[in-house]
Amino acid sequence: MSILALPELLPPTHTVPKCASMDLLNGSAYTWEQRKLGEVADIVGGGTPSTSNDDYWDGDIDWYAPAEIADQIYVASSERKITQQGYDNSSAKMLPVGTVLFTSRAGIGKTAILRKEGCTNQGFQSIVPHINELDSYFIFSRSEEMKRYGETVGAGSTFVEVSGKQMANMELMMPTTMEEQVTIGSFFSNLDSLITLHQRKSKIGKMPLK
C-alpha cells in the first residue's frame, strides 16, 4: 500500500506518522536514506530433509513451505515439522523470532513474520533484520515493493525465482533511525489490525440469520 494513499483510507482519529507524512508526502528525504536490504538484514534460504527418511520428520521444529503463507501477518506453527536429525541433515537454517519469511518461488513475495523460531524449505529467501538496524514490521510493510522487485529480477528456466543475492541487492528508501522505523512499523501494524477487525465485522454482518 502506498503511503501517499493512506490519508484517504484512515478514520478521522488516525493520522500518518509525522516522519512519513513530512518526508514522503512532501517529497523530502531529510530523515530517509537509500540502503541495500543486505546492509540491514541477512537473507537466509532454506532446505528440505530427505522425505524418504522417517527419522527426519514429525519432530518439533517448525518447517514452513510457501503454500502455507497466505494473508496472515504472523506465523507461529508450521503444517509440517522436522526432527533435530532432519534439521542437521539438511540445508535448512534456524530463523529467529521477528524474521520476515519471503517466498522466492512458486509465487514470489508472500510474506509473514515469525512469532516462534523455525526454518523453511528452499522456496524462501527470508529476511532476518539486523538488531537496531531494521524493524520487522517496517520491512513487512514493504512487502508489495519487495514482491514487485522479486518478480522483476527473478529468472529461471522453469519458473521465476529470486535469489538471496538479488534480494540483498534490493535498494530501499528507509528512515535513518530505528525510532522512525518503529513508528512507521507500529502505524502499519495498527492499520492492519483495523482492517482485519473491519473484515471480521463485515463477514459477521453477512452471515445468514437462523
Q: What kind of region is each of these model predictions?
A:
Residues M1-T13, G27-S28, S126-D135, M167-V182:
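Proline-centric
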Residues I3, E39, V182-L194, H198:
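Extracellular/lumenal glycan-associated surfaces
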Residues L6, K18-S21, P208-K210:
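Hydrophobic topology marker
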Residues P11-P12, Y30, I195-L209:
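Extended intrinsically disordered, low-complexity coil regions enriched in Ser, Thr, Gly, Ala
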Residues T15, L24-G47:
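Non-catalytic DNA-recognition/assembly elements of restriction-modification systems
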Residues P17, E33, D135, F159, ...:
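Hydrophobic (often cysteine-bearing) scaffold residues that line and stabilize catalytic clefts
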Residues G38-M174:
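DNA target-recognition domains and sequence-specific DNA-contacting regions of bacterial/archaeal
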Residues A155, T176-M178, S193:
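Loop/turn elements at beta-strand to alpha-helix junctions within RNA-recognition modules
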